[in-house]
Amino acid sequence: MKKILFAAAVMALFTVNANAQFGFGAPQQQSGEPKAPELEYVVRLNVTLGQAFTVGDTGKGTRTVIPITGGTFEGPDIKGEVLPGGADYQMQCDGRTEIEAIYCIRTDDGVSIHVRNCGIIKMGGQGGMYFRCAPKFEAPKDSKYSWMNECLFLCQPGFGAGGGITLDVWKVK
């Protein structure tokens, strides 16, 4: 019994310490209608793409690879270029496409940031389409962009000029 009480006390102390260390407050009781999270606009990426090629039916769906050949990006506090060499890896099955784009960007002040953007494309009725993604950014921890490592982002892709893609990215506040 003493071991159980000791373990409970240690867990309580750890929880209090973690809450203080990471800025978590006590869980708040939810009342009334749920409140949607706020979004803050971060950046628009204009990505140029190469010729897509199909790997074929893998048993999980049809794998297509679309090379990322470059591009630019700009937002209120960040701008630069999309580096060539990444790709958008797509898996299509039953009218639904899962995407995973992996590439790097370089800011105009010389900081390289890794991007991994996962999302879903689903064709709807009457020509509608659901196309949303959740990019993750990995910036150097000693850079002014390190805040990007600690945030959740959502993006709304669109088709750009010349067969490219445009990604508008928001931070979830």
Task: Tell where the protein language model's regions lie, with residue ranges.
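Bacterial Sec-dependent N-terminal signal peptides
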Residues: 1-24
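Beta-strand-enriched cores of mature, soluble protein domains
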Residues: 22-173
